[in-house]
Amino acid sequence: MSRFSVLSFLILAIFLGGSIVKGDVSFRLSGADPRSYGMFIKDLRNALPFREKVYNIPLLLPSVSGAGRYLLMHLFNYDGKTITVAVDVTNVYIMGYLADTTSYFFNEPAAELASQYVFRDARRKITLPYSGNYERLQIAAGKPREKIPIGLPALDSAISTLLHYDSTAAAGALLVLIQTTAEAARFKYIEQQIQERAYRDEVPSLATISLENSWSGLSKQIQLAQGNNGIFRTPIVLVDNKGNRVQITNVTSKVVTSNIQLLLNTRNIAEGDNGDVSTTHGFSSY
């Protein structure tokens, strides 16, 4: 590596506060199987910068400045047609996407900020008539995500839908996209659920929805447990596949030791948010 390249990496590291964004990630559905999907999710997790781990779980950065805040995912459908998705590396939130020469962004301040750094060469920019909030997306789609099948075939359909603008259809497609990428990166269980749906679609399990609604709460309690002998200050109630409520009270739970893969930094969690937030993707602002 040349001294110029080394210097460039050092400058980037300083700019990002000591952490380097590792680059874009890609996933092709043509020929995809559970293994290749698992590698994609692993690549997505590895591309998210962090400085420390809490109970061996990567803690996402509280903030990143400029273009380094955004990771690009290149997703190809079965026909090889592609969209590029912009992801905020501090929370794994999807900000918008590029289809052909048109960029699309959620109608919210965070996405508007992202539009200043990604897809700048797009010939046309469209602001979607909704935010990335789960509740808003479900209203726009006309159905809750509990009734929208997910799987790799559904991801193919979502990509194909997003290639052409239809705000109602796009809302449902984005619900599929969020769960098969961002949520799968956050939780090993959700990744495995999608792997089981590599060749067929099925609605999300009750446990999947419960985990999606509880990521911020779990993240918060796991971080607080560091100063409380591993005990959660506020228990998190999850729902299993059979609809049974399960109380998580400490870091020895399997949800902590082998399921959750990324932690949202407490500096990005709304005060009073202890989980069970059914209307959001992660927490209250998305």
Curated annotation (Swiss-Prot):
Keywords on record: Glycoprotein, Hydrolase, Plant defense, Protein synthesis inhibitor, Signal, Toxin
Protein origin, superkingdom: Eukaryota
GO molecular function (one): rRNA N-glycosylase activity
Signal peptide start-end: 1-23
PROSITE patterns tied to this protein: SHIGA_RICIN
InterPro entries, sorted: Ribosome-inact_prot_sf, Ribosome_inactivat_1/2, Ribosome_inactivat_prot, Ribosome_inactivat_prot_CS, Ribosome_inactivat_prot_sub1, Ribosome_inactivat_prot_sub2
EC number: 3.2.2.22
Family according to the record: Belongs to the ribosome-inactivating protein family. Type 1 RIP subfamily.
Positions annotated as propeptide: 270-286
GO biological process: defense response; negative regulation of translation
SUPFAM superfamilies per record: Ribosome inactivating proteins (RIP)
Pfam families attached to this UniProt entry: RIP
Protein name stated in the entry: Ribosome-inactivating protein momordin I
Lineage: Eukaryota, Viridiplantae, Streptophyta, Embryophyta, Tracheophyta
UniProt keyword RNA-binding, yes or no: no
Statement: the UniProt record of this protein carries the keyword Iron: no
Reaction(s) this enzyme catalyzes, per UniProt: Endohydrolysis of the N-glycosidic bond at one specific adenosine on the 28S rRNA
Record-annotated active site: E183
